[in-house]
């Protein structure tokens, strides 16, 4: 996979801004749940996250966008879905080891 250029990232961010104003995105937010942890979160506090980050080749298309609480979005950063799942598994394993 070739590196993603700054121009490509800017173009995808512009597409994300357009989608953020769409009825489709507003309906997604109206569920008031994080797409990762499913924690109830007011719509105004949900962020738009790219499942496959832009810098890793992701696009601003509906199938790659998910409402995320700020905590999940900040923790996920530039992880791919498989890396994010492994991270969550590690957290669960660590929590199981706590007496």
Where in the sequence are the language-model features?
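Short, charged surface segments at domain edges that flank catalytic/cofactor-binding sites
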Residues: 1-36
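Polybasic, low-complexity binding patches
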Residues: 2-6, 19, 55-64, 74-99
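Cys/His-coordinated zinc-binding microdomains
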Residues: 38, 70-73
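The −1 position to Zn-ligating cysteines in a subset of zinc-ribbon hairpins
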Residues: 33, 47, 68
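Short linear sequence elements within intrinsically disordered, low-complexity coil regions
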Residues: 30, 41, 89-92
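Alpha-helical architecture
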Residues: 47-48, 71, 78
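Histidine-centered nuclease catalytic patch
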Residues: 38-65
